[in-house]
């Protein structure tokens, strides 16, 4: 397995900037820092594995209503615009119990490597250990 400790991983969620302009406003989720940004789409009735990552923390920004988010043992349904902070090594899962796709923007801080995934539970019977494909 690769070394996932080579980059700084924040323990607390970085400050989210909010700036108003004459034309509207914008939120800034990462500012001058190294991160990996992904747009996840979860199909109706599907969910990611219950997983954790040693080498990165994640900020999830919910795009569509109805995302069911589990962090640790706590589970909650999120509305569009909500943010979820996931610390490195913290178990987490994204589910969709609705009838339309749910999108979540993921901003990963640290060393994003696909093989840095520990699966604790998985509906698709994938290996529990480090992976090289898929989440």
Kindly label every feature range from the protein language model.
Residues 14-56:
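A short glycine-rich, His/Asp/Glu-containing loop-to-beta-strand
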């Amino acid at each position: 397995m690769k070394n996932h400790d080579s980059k700084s991983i924040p323990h607390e969620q970085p400050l989210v900037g909010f700036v108003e302009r004459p034309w509207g406003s914008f939120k800034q989720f990462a500012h001058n820092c190294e991160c990996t940004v992904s747009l996840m789409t979860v199909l109706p009735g599907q969910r990611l594995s219950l997983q954790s990552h040693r080498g990165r923390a994640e900020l999830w920004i919910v795009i569509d209503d109805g995302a069911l988010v589990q962090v640790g043992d706590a589970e909650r349904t999120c509305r569009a615009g909500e943010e979820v902070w996931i610390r490195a090594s913290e178990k987490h899962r994204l589910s969709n119990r609705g009838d339309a796709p749910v999108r979540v923007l993921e901003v990963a801080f640290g060393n994003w490597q696909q093989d840095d995934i520990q699966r604790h539970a998985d509906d698709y019977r994938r290996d529990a250990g480090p992976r090289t494909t898929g989440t």
